[in-house]
Amino acid sequence: MHNRGMSSPSSPLSSSIADLRKSYERAELGEEASHADPLRQFDQWLQEAVAAQVPEPNAMTLATVGADLRPSTRVVLIKGYDERGIVWYTNYGSRKGRQLAGNPFAALQFHWVELERVVRIEGRVEKVSDAESDAYFASRPLDSRIGAWASPQSEVISGRGVLVANAAKYGAQFLLQPLRPPHWGGFRLKPDRWEFWQGRKSRLHDRLCYREETPGAWVRERLAP
């Protein structure tokens, strides 16, 4: 017995989704044109995404795994990157924060649709220093700083009014200088694996994988699409 409002596998809606296709012909990714250092390759592609005015080029999917071995994903914003790793900021008490506390390994993915490119990054995660978190928090707009106090991220709340009331309370309490909440700060993922994907015609996509064999020493390999 089918639930009303749910489409069966043979429904017209399902068929139309199955027929959606795109031919990727914008660019290619060869070993000779790619950097030996994956961080340089990432920097080049990110800058090209910014230059191409890709919407939210800094948005990345973060995948974590909890103690129950169930994976979960969400979109966060990259806030910095260098030879130490990829940085983002969040509520440490959120679902992702709790999962990273128990299992400090994660995966990131950037998908720049307009450029037909994907970057996947895997590695170990650690908190950034308090000084780094303090500096970034102080640079945020006032409303965002108050929001970090107002939102008990990932907790069940009775309605949006809870957030509005909390924002008003903390806004009055801190006026113009809210300090960083102790439950809020940055994470840094130290990559040990990168993959760069460039869409190609006939589904024969380019995939270059970088594996860290020893600290700072990368092996670049081509993967079958």
Swiss-Prot record:
Any matching Pfam family: PNPOx_N
Keywords: Flavoprotein, FMN, Oxidoreductase, Pyridoxine biosynthesis
Binding residues for substrate: 21-24, 79, 136, 140, 144, 203-205
GO biological process: pyridoxine biosynthetic process
HAMAP family: PdxH
Family assignment from sequence similarity: Belongs to the pyridoxamine 5'-phosphate oxidase family.
Stored PANTHER family: PYRIDOXINE-5'-PHOSPHATE OXIDASE, PYRIDOXINE-5-PHOSPHATE OXIDASE
Subunit structure as annotated in this protein's UniProt entry: Homodimer.
UniProt protein name: Pyridoxine/pyridoxamine 5'-phosphate oxidase
